[in-house]
Each structure stands twice: as structure tokens, then as C-alpha cells.
Amino acid sequence: MTNNEQQKGAELQEKLVQVNRVAKVVKGGRIFGFTALTVVGDGNGKVGFGRGKAREVPVAIQKAMDAARKNMITVTLNGNTLQYPVKARHGSAKVFMQPASEGTGIIAGGAMRAVLEVAGVQNVLAKCYGSTNPVNVVRATFEGLKAMQAPEEIAAKRGKTVEEILG
């Protein structure tokens, strides 16, 4: 890892979403392993998630953090909230996120809350429908955040001004 990457890693917020114990049954008994799901973000629109597997919890968490740093996306925020309401799904997990006024806070549950906190979203109303499996909820949240575009990008694609797009 270069010095620049170490400095970037120091300012990232890290959150552990889930640790799961799994068992492999063999002739002599069970062999236990652990999986970890983590999210990292700079609190300013960059966010990533990762999964790690190992025989011990700390090693699994470290692997997940490393994977999350390699899997970062940039989210275009409108101040400290979302640009517009977003729906997304991954598997059977469906998420709905909508911008909220100043002072609302993050109204979201579990895995979704962790992603939105480290992404730097401070005011949002969010709901999860269908499956609440943390892995699928995190992936669905990422799909929604990835799909969100700034009004400037949409205006440029349509050949209109930002004022026409926003109404």
C-alpha cells in the first residue's frame, strides 16, 4: 500500500454491518468459520462495501474492510441529502429512499442506515421492503445510490437547462 492510500484509509469511516458464523460439518465434528459485512465511506459522497471470510472474526472483518476500500463508488449528494426519491432492488430486497428536509436525520433501519451514515447523507427517509437480509439490503442501497444522477448530468443528456429539469 502506498503512503497516499494509507492517508486515504485513515480518514474513512468504517462500520461493521454483520458478522455471521458458518459451520462446515466433517467426520470429526464441525469446523466454524466467520463472514463479515462492512461498509466504509469518507462522509462526503464516497462509499464502499465489502465481505470477508475467515476462521476468526477479526481476520474476517479486516478482509471485509480491505474489500470495501477497493469497491468504492461516488454518490452525488444535494447538500447533505439525496437528489430525488430513489427505488432499487437486489434479489428480494427492495429499498426506497427519499430526500428529507434539514434536521430530519437518517430515518432508516439496520444495514441501510450504516451505508447512508458513512456516505455522508444526514437527512433521508428510507424504507426496506421484502427481504431484510443485510447483504441484499446493502447491495440494493448501493444500486439506488449508483443510479442517482446530478441534475446537471440529466440536463446535459437531454440538451436542456438545469432550471427546465428542476421545473
UniProtKB/Swiss-Prot annotation:
Matching PROSITE patterns: RIBOSOMAL_S5 (PS00585), S5_DSRBD (PS50881)
Role description: With S4 and S12 plays an important role in translational accuracy.
One GO cellular component term noted in the UniProt record for this chain: small ribosomal subunit
Quaternary structure, from the entry: Part of the 30S ribosomal subunit. Contacts proteins S4 and S8.
GO BP term, example: translation
Domain S5 DRBM: 12-75
Gene name linked to the record: rpsE
Keyword Ribonucleoprotein: yes
Record organism: Hahella chejuensis (strain KCTC 2396)
Keyword Repeat (UniProt): no
Record family assignment: Belongs to the universal ribosomal protein uS5 family.
Protein name: Small ribosomal subunit protein uS5
Domain remark in the UniProt entry: The N-terminal domain interacts with the head of the 30S subunit; the C-terminal domain interacts with the body and contacts protein S4. The interaction surface between S4 and S5 is involved in control of translational fidelity.
Keywords: Ribonucleoprotein, Ribosomal protein, RNA-binding, rRNA-binding
Pfam families xrefs: Ribosomal_S5 (PF00333), Ribosomal_S5_C (PF03719)
UniProt GO MF annotations: rRNA binding; structural constituent of ribosome
